[in-house]
């Protein structure tokens, strides 16, 4: 299913999330199972299925990584069950530095400063990746779609690192 069509957007990485939320509410009202309470079982089932599609579509388009994956899937690149790893050596070296920095937080004299610095580093790198991803997804070239897939892999890794940093910060605050 093309969620961009469902929500009446052109397939693009940059979408107006306020408009997305508004269209989500409109679609929810139109397909909500309560509207079909007195209809046939088949119509009730169809309503439940449409509601699930609308919910999944909203969650997909709302999340930048899932939105990028959806755009790539529309171009024939499926990352949903992928096990391919990033082969970019510069990124792998940066990844190792971040992992070391995460380990060093526990032994830091000012762990909150270290945490803040890592959050800032992650945000800057994610912004750079997102900028490149946007350009690659807006391109119609197949090689740019493959490069975009690599950016998505990196962003997924960055999301995991961010979650790990948040867990470390929460543990230090407890």
UniProtKB/Swiss-Prot annotation:
Q: Does this UniProt record's set of keywords contain Chaperone?
A: yes
Keyword entries, A-Z: Chaperone
**GO BP annotations, alphabetical order:** [2Fe-2S] cluster assembly; protein complex oligomerization; protein folding
PROSITE patterns in the cross-refs: DNAJ_2
What the entry lists under InterPro entries is as follows: DnaJ_domain, HscB, HscB_C_sf, HscB_oligo_C, J_dom_sf
Gene Ontology CC terms: iron-sulfur cluster transfer complex
- Residue ranges of every copy of the J domain listed in the record: 2-74
Cysteine pairs forming cystine bridges in this chain are none
- Pfam families hit by this protein: HSCB_C
Q: Which domain of life is it from?
A: Bacteria
Q: Which CDD domains match?
A: DnaJ (cd06257)
Molecular function (GO) terms for this protein are: ATPase activator activity; protein-folding chaperone binding
The record's annotation in HAMAP family points to: HscB
* Subunit description: Interacts with HscA and stimulates its ATPase activity.
Similarity-based family: Belongs to the HscB family.
Function of this protein? Co-chaperone involved in the maturation of iron-sulfur cluster-containing proteins. Seems to help targeting proteins to be folded toward HscA.
The protein here is known as Co-chaperone protein HscB homolog
What is the originating organism of this protein? Answer: Shewanella sp. (strain W3-18-1)
């Amino acid at each position: 299913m093309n969620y961009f069509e469902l929500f009446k957007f052109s397939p693009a990485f940059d979408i107006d999330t306020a408009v997305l939320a508004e269209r989500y509410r409109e679609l929810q009202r139109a397909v909500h199972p309560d509207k079909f309470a007195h209809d046939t079982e088949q119509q009730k089932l169809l309503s439940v299925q449409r509601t699930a599609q609308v919910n999944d579509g909203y969650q997909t388009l709302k999340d930048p990584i899932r939105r990028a994956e959806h755009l790539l899937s529309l171009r024939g690149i499926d990352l949903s069950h992928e096990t391919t790893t990033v082969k970019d050596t510069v990124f792998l070296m940066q990844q190792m530095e971040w992992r070391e920095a995460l380990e060093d937080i526990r032994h830091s004299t000012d762990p909150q400063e270290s945490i803040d610095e890592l959050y800032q580093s992650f945000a800057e790198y994610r912004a750079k990746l997102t900028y490149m991803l946007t350009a690659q997804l807006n391109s119609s070239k197949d090689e740019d779609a493959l490069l975009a897939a690599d950016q998505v892999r990196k962003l997924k890794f960055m999301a995991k690192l961010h979650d790990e940093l948040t867990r470390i910060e929460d543990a230090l605050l407890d």
